[in-house]
């Protein structure tokens, strides 16, 4: 078998899990219950968030929140402050694709 299969949690409970940490890409899986949030952080690479369930509420650089429903792919540039919340009534589930892998990027600003 030439391909590699990776698994991820199927849950409604909060989870942040690294699925792939390869030289060229980093892929994470995140589930956030209604009213909860991901810890505030700075994008440490070029980030693409693939929303598969619920609505992702995103504030960049302390701006107003934009809301991205399931079926959206949200691109976030390197080195921006990110606040990710689930402001909806449904569980939020999304995948984060970081390319290149953050290990190859320069240091990010401090928040």
Where are each of the predicted segments found?
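A short, N-terminal "cap"/entry segment at the start of jelly-roll beta-barrel domains
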Residues: 1-24, 40, 105-111
């Amino acid at each position: 078998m030439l391909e590699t299969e990776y698994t991820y949690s199927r849950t409604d409970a909060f989870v942040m899990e690294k699925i792939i940490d390869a030289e060229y890409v980093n892929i994470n899986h995140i589930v956030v219950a209604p009213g909860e949030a991901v810890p505030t952080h700075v994008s440490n690479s070029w980030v693409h968030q693939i929303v598969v369930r619920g609505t992702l509420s995103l504030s960049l650089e302390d701006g107003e929140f934009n809301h991205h429903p399931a079926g959206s792919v949200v691109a976030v540039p390197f080195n921006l402050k990110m606040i990710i919340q689930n402001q909806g009534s449904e569980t939020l589930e999304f995948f984060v694709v970081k390319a290149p892998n953050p290990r190859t990027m320069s240091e990010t600003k401090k928040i």
